[in-house]
């Protein structure tokens, strides 16, 4: 990963949508995205361009906030760009937008 980047992509989901977004970030910026999905599923699991983390309760409010906060702390020196790659994750991001750490933005 290019350490000079000022942002870190954080993706929620585990399907081809997540892989496509991660691939776009990787091709444009050389960055490896962090992604949380419910299952160790293809094509995200074991991808070289995604730090894929399995979270069985990924769609719960508690897990969403816990995972967002953990990545915000892990990348405290960067702006974490949180993207939901599915309707349920977009809803979680919208619902908890005001409860995310300062270095996390959810457009």
Regions found by a protein language model. Give the residues of each.
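ATP-binding N-terminal substructure of ATP-dependent carboxylate-amine bond-forming enzymes
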Residues: 1-107
């Amino acid at each position: 990963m290019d350490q000079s980047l000022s942002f870190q992509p954080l993706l929620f989901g585990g399907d081809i949508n997540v892989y496509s977004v991660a691939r776009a970030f990787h091709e444009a910026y050389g960055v490896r995205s962090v992604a949380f999905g419910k299952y160790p599923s293809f094509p995200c699991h074991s991808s070289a361009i995604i730090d894929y983390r399995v979270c069985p309760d990924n769609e719960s409010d508690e897990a969403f906030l816990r995972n967002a906060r953990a990545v915000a702390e892990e990348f405290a020196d960067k702006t974490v760009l949180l993207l939901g790659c599915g309707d349920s994750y977009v809803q979680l991001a919208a619902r908890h937008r005001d409860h995310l750490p300062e270095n996390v933005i959810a457009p």
